[in-house]
Amino acid sequence: MTPAKPSVDMEPAYENHPTGANKPRIDAHKVRSQAYSAMLAGAAGHGYGSLDLFWFYKDADGPFPKDGFQHWRKAIAYEGSRQVGLMRRLFEQRPWHKMVPDQSAIALEQGQGTQRLVTARAKDGSFVIAYLAVRLQEVSGVSDWPI
C-alpha cells in the first residue's frame, strides 16, 4: 500500500489452542515466534491470546483440566504470555519505531515457519534485533541481559 499503513497483529495463534485431532496444541514457542516475526517485519504492535483466557473458565466450570483446557488463573501465567511480555520490554528499551525489516543481516538460511530467522535494524544502523531459537542448554557460560 502507498502510503504505508501501520498494522497490528491482533489475532495470532492462541496459546493452548488445539491444532487438530491427535496434534499438539499451540505452545509458547509458536506464540513467541509469531510475536517476533510480526514485530521484526514492521508491525506497530502484537496482541497475545490464550484460548483458556478467551473461555474464561472459573471454579464452577471445573474440574480442570477440562477437555484439555485450564482455569483462567492458570492460563494467565502461561509461558507464552511471559515471553511476549519479555519481548515488549526488549522493544521498549530501544527506539523500535525507528526499525526497518532487514533480512540481509542474516548470514544463514532464513528457514520457514517457527524456524524462520527474522531481523530488523535501526534506520541509522545503531542496533539490530534478530529472532532465532537457541538451545541454551548446549551453550556453556550462558548469561542473560536484564530486560
Task: List where the protein language model places each region.
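Active-site clefts of carbohydrate-active enzymes
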Residues: M1-V31
